[in-house]
UniProtKB/Swiss-Prot annotation:
Subcellular location: Cytoplasm
A Pfam family annotated for this UniProt entry: Ste5_C
Gene Ontology MF terms in the entry: G-protein beta-subunit binding; kinase binding; MAP-kinase scaffold activity; phosphatidylinositol-4,5-bisphosphate binding
Family, similarity comment: To yeast FAR1.
Protein name as it appears in the record: Protein STE5
Gene3D superfamilies, sorted: Protein Ste5, Fus3-binding domain (3.40.50.11070)
Post-translational modification as stated in the protein's UniProt record: May be regulated at the phosphorylation level, and by the mating type of the cell and depends on an intact pheromone-response pathway.
Function, in words: Component of the pheromone signal transduction pathway. It mediates pheromone signals acting between STE20 and STE11. It is absolutely required for pheromone-induced transcription of FUS1. May play a role in cell-cycle arrest in response to pheromone.
Extra remark: Present with 1900 molecules/cell in log phase SD medium.
Main location class: cytoplasm
Alphabetized InterPro entries for the sequence: Ste5_C_sf, Ste5_Fus-binding, Ste5_Fus3-bd_dom
Length: 917
C-alpha cells in the first residue's frame, strides 16, 4: 500500500485511530471492533472529526445490541510506523470500549515503572483494591478476554451513562478511635480499622486489648463501652463490630487465647473509663473528668484460703505531698506533728502522712495533671440520694456524727441466706455499713431505693470467703444485739471479684484511703462537673473549684485553697421549679450557671480586730495534741491582734468561757479544764455581741466560728446568724465559718459559705490565708501596708464577699449629743439594732463622689484623747508617699461638708486617726 506524504505528518487534531491499518488481531473488547476505512485526502481536522462522530454513533448503537463472544479477530493489535513509536494498545490499561485512545499515549517500554504503594488511610470498599485484581495487564502481555470485561471496571464512563457504584463511600479521614481517642490513620502495619454498630470507629488492637473478663453465659459482655456514645448521648453502648463475621472471629480468638481472671491487671472500665457528661465552659478551658476503678493486686480468693495481704501501712510508704485531694482517715489513726509549738513561728504547716497517701493501685493511678472530680462532691451526691429516699429513717447530722465519712459505695448483689440475691446499693462508712435495695436507677438524678438496713458498729465485723467471688460478713444490725449474715457478690453467674476484693481491703484496714478515683467502681458519677479555676494573674491558680448537680434542684460548688489540698470551701445554689423541669437539657443548665457571678474564694479583708468562737466536742479530741494546737493558735493570733476576743462553747451550745485571750488564756490548763466545766448560759451571737461590744462596733471586726461538733441545726454555732457583728458602715459581717473534719452532707442551703479543714492543725493556716496574715520574723506593720500596696492585695480581695470598697467613710466620735443632726447623716444602708437610735455617738459621712482619683479607700476616725489612746496604734501606718494626696482629699471633703466647722474645731482637741478600709 502506498503512503501519502500527509500520513507522516503529526497534527494535534489528528486522530491516529482513523489512519491505522489492520496488521493482526485487534486488542479491543468485542464492543469496540469497528470497520475502519482507508484514510482519505481530507484535512486532518475533518478526518478526525469524522472519525469521532462515527465512533460516538457506534457506541450509542452498540449499547442496545447483545454482547457476543470474542472472535479471533478481537485478539489482533494495531501497528504503526516504527518512526511514530505510538501504539493504541498501550494506553495505561484503558482497554475498555468506553475509553478513547489519544494520540499522546506513549509506549510503556519507554516509561519508568513505579512500585505499587498502599496508603495508611482507610479506603472505601472497591474491587480495584482486592488482591485478585491487583495484577493489571501489561502492554506486552496479551489480555485474557474472559476477565477483561468483567474484572476491570471502566474508569471513565461515556457521556450520558450513569456511574454504577457498588458501595457507599465513607470518609474516615478525620475520624478518631473511640477507645484511645487517637486518629484512626495512626495505626500499626497491617492493623485494621473496625466500624462499630453505633457508627464510630476503633482500632483493631484497641478493641482486642479492651476485652474484659466474662462468663460463658454472657459472651457479648466482653466488648467495652463506647466512650463517644457515653459522652454524646449519655447511653451505655458496647463497641460491637458492624460486621458479624468479624465479631465472631474476635470472640472466638479471645476465648481460645483467654487469660485467667487472676492474671488480668486491668479491665476495660479501668483502661478506658467512660467520660462523665461535661458542661461546656463560658470562655474557660476545662479538661474532661474521668472516673477510674480500683482493682486490688491480690490474686483471686479461693474457698477457705487466707486473704491476700492488705496494702502497705501509712508508715511504710515514703511521705510526699498529696496528689489526691480531700483524703481522710479516722481520727483515732491520725498522728498530729509533735512539734506543734513551732506553729507560732511558721504557719506553713506541712501535710501529714495520713493525708498524703492514696490507696489506689499504681496500675490505675491517674495522671497528676488530670482534672479530677473532688471527693466532697461525690460524697454529697451519694448521701443526697440516701436522704432523698429515706427522709424519715435518716437525719443528715446523724450520718456525719454517727456513721463517719463515706469510704465506699457500689452496686452489689446481697443475700441473707446465700441463695436469693438482691441488687442493692452498699455504703461503707467509717463506722457503719448501709444497704438499700434498688427500685429504679435508670436516671442518675431520680434514683429510687427501698428497704434500708443499717449495720453499726462495724468494729467487730467478721469476714470469711466462701468462693473466689463470694464474701460473707457477720455483723450487728443497728439497735439489735443479734448478729446477721450477709453474702456479697459482684455479679451472679460471674467470677468477677475485683470490686469485692476492694471491699475486703477496705474492711480489713481502716486506714485504707479511697479517693475520688476509686470510691465507686459500679455507679455513675455526677452528671455535671465544671472547672472554675481562677487565674490570679501571676501564673498560678488561687482555687480549683468544681460545680456539680447533686440534686435535680441543687447545684453545689466546691473548691480548695491553693497549695493546701486539706482545706476546702463549698457553697450551693437552689434552682427554682421552672428550671428544674428543664434539667434534661444542657442549655438550661448553662442559663442557670450564668447567674453565678461571684468567685468562690477564701480571701477576706484584713480586719482591725478579731473575735473567735470555738465550739469543741471533747469526746472527738482523741489526741491530746489537738488541745495544744488550739492553745498555740490562739497565742499566735495575739501577735497580730492584741485585743483578740474568744468564746468557748460546748457541743450542746452552752458557753464555757469568754473574754480576752491575753487576760484569760495564760496556759494550756485554761483550755483543758473546760472539759469538766458546765454552764447554763445558752450561746447566741446577740448575747456575745452585747457582752463583748455593748455599744456599736467602731472598728473593722472579723468574726470566726470554728466547730468540730455535730452539725445539728439547733446546737451547732455554724448555723447561727452573725450579722449583728457587722461593722459600722458595712452591709454584712466579715465572717469565716470553719468545720473541723470533713462532711458527707452538703449544708450549703443553710450556710452560705462553709470551710472544711481536715484537723485543728490547719485552722490557723486557714485564718492566715483568709485574712492575709503573715508571721515573718522581720515583718512589721509598715512593711505589711507597703506589701499590700505593692502586691495589690486589695485588688485580689475583690473576689471575696467583702463589700468595703469605693467609698471614703468618716467616723467621728463627737462630744456633742445632737440626735437629729447625726440621724440625718447616717447612711441609709447601715443596719442599726434596736435600742441604738436613742444614743448615737458615731457620725458617718460617705463622700465617694468627691474622692480624688489618686486617693485610696481611707477611713477617718476622730477620737477624744481619753477614748483614743488605745486605738491609735496604726496612726503612723500610712505610706509616706500618700500623705500629700490624703491632705488634698481631706481639704476637699471639709470644703464640701456641712460639718466643716465641727471638724476644724475638733482638730484642736482630738487627734485625727486614719487607717485603710
Amino acid at each position: 500500500m502506498m503512503e501519502t506524504p500527509t500520513d507522516n505528518i503529526v497534527s494535534p487534531f489528528h486522530n491516529f485511530g482513523s489512519s491505522t491499518q489492520y496488521s493482526g488481531t485487534l486488542s479491543r473488547t468485542p464492543n469496540q471492533i469497528i470497520e475502519l476505512e482507508k484514510p482519505s485526502t481530507l484535512s486532518p481536522l475533518s478526518r478526525g472529526k469524522k472519525w469521532t462522530e462515527k465512533l460516538a454513533r457506534f457506541q450509542r448503537s452498540s449499547a442496545k445490541k447483545k454482547r457476543f463472544s470474542p472472535s479471533p479477530i478481537s485478539s489482533s493489535t494495531f501497528s504503526f510506523s516504527p518512526k511514530s513509536r505510538v501504539t493504541s494498545s498501550n494506553s495505561s490499561g484503558n482497554e475498555d470500549g468506553n475509553l478513547m485512545n489519544t494520540p499522546s499515549t506513549v509506549s510503556t517500554d519507554y516509561l519508568p515503572q513505579h512500585p505499587h504503594r498502599t496508603s495508611s488511610l482507610p479506603r472505601p470498599n472497591s474491587n480495584l483494591f482486592h488482591a485478585s485484581n491487583s495484577n493489571l495487564s501489561r502492554a506486552n502481555e496479551p489480555p485474557r478476554a474472559e476477565n477483561l470485561s468483567d474484572n476491570i471496571p471502566p474508569k471513565v464512563a461515556p457521556f450520558g451513562y450513569p456511574i454504577q457504584r457498588t458501595s457507599i463511600k465513607k470518609s474516615f479521614l478525620n475520624a478518631s478511635c473511640t477507645l484511645c481517642d487517637e486518629p484512626i490513620s495512626n495505626r500499626r502495619k497491617g492493623e485494621k480499622i473496625i466500624e462499630l454498630a453505633c457508627g464510630h470507629l476503633s482500632h483493631q488492637e484497641c478493641l482486642i486489648i479492651s476485652f474484659g473478663t466474662t462468663s460463658k453465659a454472657d459472651v457479648r459482655a466482653l466488648f467495652p463501652f463506647c466512650t463517644k456514645c457515653k459522652k454524646d448521648t449519655n447511653k451505655a453502648v458496647q463497641c460491637i463490630p458492624e460486621n458479624d463475621e468479624l465479631k465472631d472471629i474476635l470472640i472466638s480468638d479471645f476465648l481460645i487465647h483467654k487469660i485467667p481472671d487472676s492474671e488480668l491487671s486491668i479491665t476495660p472500665q479501668s483502661r478506658f473509663p467512660p467520660y462523665s457528661p461535661l458542661l461546656p465552659p463560658f470562655g474557660l478551658s476545662y479538661t474532661p473528668v474521668e472516673r477510674q476503678t480500683i482493682y486490688s493486686q491480690a490474686p483471686s480468693l479461693n474457698p477457705n484460703l487466707i486473704l491476700a495481704a492488705p496494702p502497705k501501712e501509712r508508715n511504710q510508704i515514703p511521705q510526699k505531698k498529696s496528689n489526691y485531694t480531700f483524703l481522710h482517715s479516722p481520727l483515732g489513726h491520725r498522728r498530729i506533728p509533735s512539734g506543734a509549738n513551732s506553729i507560732l513561728a511558721d504557719t506553713s504547716v506541712a501535710l501529714s502522712a495520713n493525708d498524703s497517701i492514696s490507696a489506689v493501685s499504681n496500675s490505675v493511678r491517674a495522671k497528676d495533671d488530670e482534672t479530677k472530680t473532688t471527693l466532697p462532691l461525690l460524697r454529697s451526691y451519694f448521701i443526697q440520694i440516701l436522704l432523698n429516699n429515706f427522709q424519715e429513717e435518716l437525719q443528715d447530722w446523724r450520718i456525719d456524727g454517727d456513721y463517719g465519712l463515706l469510704r465506699l459505695v457500689d452496686k452489689l448483689m446481697i443475700s441473707k441466706d446465700g441463695q436469693r440475691y438482691i441488687q442493692c446499693w452498699c455504703f461503707l462508712f467509717e463506722d457503719a455499713f448501709v444497704i438499700a435495695e434498688v427500685d429504679n436507677d435508670v436516671d442518675v438524678l431520680e434514683i429510687r431505693l427501698k428497704n434500708l438496713e443499717v449495720f453499726t458498729p462495724i468494729a467487730n465485723l467478721r469476714m470469711t470467703t466462701l468462693e473466689a467471688s463470694v464474701l460473707k460478713c457477720t455483723l450487728n444490725k443497728q439497735h439489735c444485739a443479734d448478729l446477721s449474715d450477709l453474702y456479697i457478690v459482684q455479679n451472679i453467674n460471674s467470677d468477677e471479684s475485683t470490686t469485692v476484693q476492694k471491699w475486703i481491703s477496705g474492711i480489713l484496714n481502716q486506714d485504707f484511703v479511697f479517693n475520688e478515683d476509686n470510691i465507686t467502681s459500679t455507679l455513675p458519677i455526677l452528671p455535671i462537673i465544671k472547672n472554675f479555676s481562677k487565674d490570679v494573674g501571676n501564673g498560678r491558680h488561687e482555687t480549683s473549684t468544681f460545680l456539680g448537680l447533686i440534686n435535680p434542684n441543687k447545684v453545689v460548688e466546691v473548691g480548695n485553697v491553693h497549695d493546701n489540698d486539706t482545706v476546702i470551701i463549698r457553697r450551693g445554689f437552689t434552682l427554682n421549679s421552672g428550671e428544674c423541669s428543664r434539667q434534661s437539657t444542657v442549655d438550661s443548665i448553662q442559663s442557670v450557671l450564668t447567674t453565678i457571678s461571684s468567685i468562690l474564694s477564701l480571701k477576706r479583708e484584713k480586719p482591725d480586730n478579731l473575735a473567735i468562737i470555738l465550739q469543741i466536742d471533747f469526746t472527738k479530741l482523741k489526741e491530746e495534741d489537738s488541745l495544744i494546737v488550739v492553745y498555740n493558735s490562739l497565742k499566735a493570733l495575739t501577735i497580730k491582734f492584741a485585743r483578740l476576743q474568744f468564746c468557748f462553747v460546748d457541743r450542746n451550745n452552752y458557753v464555757l468561757d469568754y473574754g480576752s485571750v491575753l487576760h484569760k488564756i495564760d496556759s494550756l490548763d485554761s483550755i483543758s479544764n473546760l472539759k469538766s466545766k458546765s454552764s447554763s448560759t445558752q450561746f447566741s451571737p446577740i448575747w456575745l455581741k452585747n457582752t463583748l461590744y455593748p455599744e456599736n462596733i467602731h472598728e473593722h471586726l472579723g468574726i470566726v466560728a470554728v466547730s468540730n461538733s455535730n452539725m445539728e441545726a439547733k446546737k451547732s454555732i455554724l448555723f447561727q446568724d452573725y450579722r449583728c457583728f457587722t461593722s459600722f458602715g458595712r452591709r454584712r459581717p466579715n465572717e469565716l465559718k470553719i468545720k473541723v473534719g470533713y462532711l458527707n452532707v452538703d449544708y450549703s442551703d443553710k450556710i452560705d459559705e462553709l470551710v472544711e479543714a481536715s484537723s485543728w492543725t490547719f485552722v490557723l493556716e486557714t485564718l492566715c490565708y483568709s485574712f492575709g496574715l503573715s508571721f515573718d520574723e522581720h515583718d512589721d506593720d509598715d512593711e505589711e501596708d507597703n506589701d499590700d500596696s505593692t502586691d495589690n492585695e486589695l485588688d485580689n480581695s475583690s473576689g471575696s464577699l467583702s463589700d468595703a470598697e469605693s467609698t471614703t467613710t468618716i467616723h467621728i466620735d463627737s462630744p456633742f449629743d445632737n440626735e437629729n443632726a447625726t440621724a440625718n447623716m447616717v447612711n441609709d444602708r447601715n443596719l442599726l439594732t434596736e435600742g441604738e437610735h436613742s444614743n448615737i455617738e458615731n457620725l458617718e459621712t460617705v463622700a465617694s463622689s468627691v474622692q480624688p482619683a489618686l486617693i485610696p479607700n481611707i477611713r477617718f476616725s476622730l477620737h477624744s484623747e481619753e477614748e483614743g489612746t488605745n486605738e491609735n496604734e496604726n496612726e503612723n501606718d500610712m505610706p509616706v508617699l500618700l500623705l500629700s494626696d490624703m491632705d488634698k482629699g481631706i481639704d476637699g471633703i471639709t470644703r464640701r461638708s456641712s460639718f466643716s466647722s465641727l471638724i476644724e474645731s475638733g482638730n484642736n482637741n482630738c487627734p485625727l486617726h486614719m487607717d485603710y478600709i
